[in-house]
Amino acid sequence: MDLTSVLSLETWVLLAISLVLLYRLGTHKYDIFKKQGIPGPKPLPFLGNVLNYYKGIWTFDIECHKKYGKIWGLFEGQRPLFTVTDTEMIKNVLVKECYSIFTNRRDFGPVGIMSKAVSISKDEEWKRIRALLSPTFTSGKLKEMFPIIEQYGDILVKFLRREAEKGNPVTTKEVFGAYSMDVITSTAFGVSVDSLNNPKDLLWKGRKLLRFDFFDPLFLSVVLFPFLIPIYEKLNVSMFPKDSISFFRKFVDKTKENRLDYNQKHRVDFLQLMMNSHDNSKDSHKALSDMEIIAQSIIFIFAGYDTTSSTLSFALYLLATHPDVQKKLQEEIDIALPNKARPSYDKVMEMEYLDMVLNETLRLYPIGSRLERVCKQDVEMDGVFVPKGSIVMVPVFALHYDPQYWPEPEKFRPERFSKENKGSIDPYIFLPFGNGPRNCIGMRFALMNMKLALTKVLQNFSLQPCKETQIPMKLSRKAMLQPEKPIILKVVPRDAIITGA
């Protein structure tokens, strides 16, 4: 049947007008960059540029940086992203105008009680929570926590030794995921969990928190249609798995009750330090509420578990595939800790080459591949008009691979971070933990934890590639930076003396 004979001319005209109006509805915001002469990839109606992310957000960002230069425009749905790589503009966003204009991160969807977490909260609420949490991460508090973390380094060494004796290669993410969970639960809650040898609910619930993908239907729906967020909130829909949140909420509540019953104010874990804020706060309304304490506790797990285990996995892969670097680092460790002496906080943090290796790992594999801030008011920045509600995005991964700042950026060269070279590194180009007042609050804790783990492992073992090791390693296309295939390495004992065994 011929449609032209069935539908009248008026119907065809109405249909054509409807399609034009639909197209205009899906593209009417897309001229914001064109009017200002800002380049960028062409967006699709309603979708914007999100389909470009399928190849990997970091790959897409590198391509755009090469093609468009220091500033370009993207759209996620119809929301504009001003992408900047100019260091002065980055400094303005992350530091100078942090408190006035670029205070908040974007809404990533309905999050329930997690809206109280320090990394998600906004404006004055964020300032208050951040101020109360900051004393938890002083060098003095970290030194007190160091012996707690070291005992899990001993457990890690014992586990690796058993696997080495059996001739089993190890899947690094699984091993360091369990190690990270144990360290977090002990330092955050004072609870001893041996996830390496007895994986239980705590580890699995923690893993479930991290199953995040940009193309998850719920996440994609709020990116394309932000007006759905309050609707989801009213329906009690959350980006975080309900069973995991419920599990950790009960876990924190029970731990808190035990503390109150036995008056354990002397403890140095994060939970106790947060509980003590009730007593230490001069103004009662400034103290952390019970709900805020639960949110911070869960975000410690969410933020600390994957970042630490992934970075350690990447570091050991790089060391296994660069035996000269591994040997040099082992020599530094042996000199600092002769006869396999037990590490101390000061000794670990003073090791220069260890710091260089870890920084170069974080350059090559920054777990947070982007930094984003929401513009709270219309503002002109370096001649560019940024309207209220827009997102200003810093493509960290692309900056870390920019040959203008890093010669042969794809190569693993710890010497980039030597004393001689470190002074020339722009702090707004190397951004593994962000910068400014809203940088990663747990940065010092994470660095201490990772340095201790590397020290314990390399004191006792050498890492080698095996037949299961993917060389060269390819990155997954998922939102969280991770390898396409699990990193699997052979662990070889350095000698018969194993500390912590």
Swiss-Prot record:
State one molecular function term (GO). testosterone 6-beta-hydroxylase activity
Q: Which UniProt keywords apply?
A: Endoplasmic reticulum, Heme, Iron, Membrane, Metal-binding, Microsome, Monooxygenase, Oxidoreductase
What tissues has this protein been observed in?
A: Expressed constitutively in liver.
Positions contributing to heme binding: C440
- Catalysed transformations (reactions): an organic molecule + reduced [NADPH--hemoprotein reductase] + O2 = an alcohol + oxidized [NADPH--hemoprotein reductase] + H2O + H(+)
Q: Which GO terms describe its biological process?
A: oxidative demethylation; steroid metabolic process
Top-tier EC class: oxidoreductase
Q: Where in the cell is it found?
A: Endoplasmic reticulum membrane; Microsome membrane
Record GO cellular component, one term? endoplasmic reticulum membrane
Task: State a single Pfam family of this protein.
Answer: p450
Q: What induces it?
A: Induced by phenobarbital and repressed by 3-methylcholanthrene or dexamethasone.
Q: How does it sit in the membrane?
A: Peripheral membrane protein
Which cofactors does it use?
Answer: heme
The Enzyme Commission number assigned here is 1.14.14.1
Q: What does this protein do?
A: Cytochromes P450 are a group of heme-thiolate monooxygenases. In liver microsomes, this enzyme is involved in an NADPH-dependent electron transport pathway. It oxidizes a variety of structurally unrelated compounds, including steroids, fatty acids, and xenobiotics.
Membership in a protein family: Belongs to the cytochrome P450 family.
Instruction: Read off the PANTHER family from this record.
Output: CYTOCHROME P450 3A-RELATED, CYTOCHROME P450 FAMILY 3
Q: What is this protein called?
A: Cytochrome P450 3A31
Q: Which organism is it from?
A: Mesocricetus auratus
